[in-house]
Amino acid sequence: MKKQLLIAAVAATMGTAAIADIAITGNMKVNYTNTDTNGTVSNKVNHEANLVIAGSNGDTSVHIEMALDDSANDTAQATTVGLEDVYLTTSVGDIKLKTGAWNGSDTILDSDSTRTSGNYIVSTDISGVALSVEGDTQEASTSVKVAGTVSGVALSYKAKATQDEITVAGSIAGVSIAYANIDHDDANKDKSSIKVDYSTNGFDLSYVTADADSGATITGDSWFGDMAAVVRNTGTNDIGLEAGTDVSGFGVKTTLAGNTVQAKFIEIDATTVAEDTSIVKLVATRALANGTTLEVTYTDADSDTAADDQETLDLELAVKF
């Protein structure tokens, strides 16, 4: 009997230790979207589920992300679980390594980078300055980044094969200001953005502007929304902004009766004047008692070309675990 109890205790201890090194998280959302493009109405229901498995052993960890995504109403995507980000992180002394496959992060100017295999980031800190080398199996993708803080101002410089990227961020009297610039080797392909944030009396206020040279295109999916998915000409079904198009916007966010409410007013100053567009986006988010979150988004895009006017109502039910 004592042996059986001892074996059970050891097994329980080993099981606990094994489980403690593995974490499973995930989320799922279902969206109903009603779109009215100058009187032509469409409806669709999409779903997306994500599962993340994170494991670790000492200073080494592994991240595996899987997804079931029907965002394009594609039968294969709706029924097939696919691998997304898969990477390993570890360290040797002061040197950190991340390698595998993952998407980059969205910015105001650019959408996240295409997921490729063989990605790596080697990084370290020297006297408060962060140094990193990033790339993949293609030599042309290699970049070097230097980042640090000077007198409370965060600075970074990233040298890529065909362009240099600079960011500056800080705050003055409670006003946060962030500047980003992409200096391309080719003529007329530079672009830059400025973001200003300020909070007062329970309201979060923000202003963003993004400027592109005649040969540069803004594709970001952070503050403005997915600029790479903007329909600018329903007649030819052109998607995304034209090169040289500038974007600006003002936003306000607050809490009202237990709901998070925000509004954004966006102006697209298109290269082709007939494609200038004013966008009003209203979003209300509420946590429900059943553990889900309901988000209602209404978007009104008013184009200088009436045929491109579009109203969208999106209802999203989401859960995280």
Language-model segments: what does each one mean?
Residues 157, 161-218:
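Long, internal scaffold/assembly segments composed of regular secondary structure
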Residues 38, 74-76, 182-189, 212-242, ...:
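Solvent-exposed loop segments that connect transmembrane elements
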Residues 79, 91, 182, 191, ...:
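Compositionally biased, intrinsically disordered or low-complexity tracts enriched in glycine
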Residues 2-150, 157-159, 170-173, 180-182, ...:
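Beta-barrel outer-membrane channel/assembly domains of diderm bacteria
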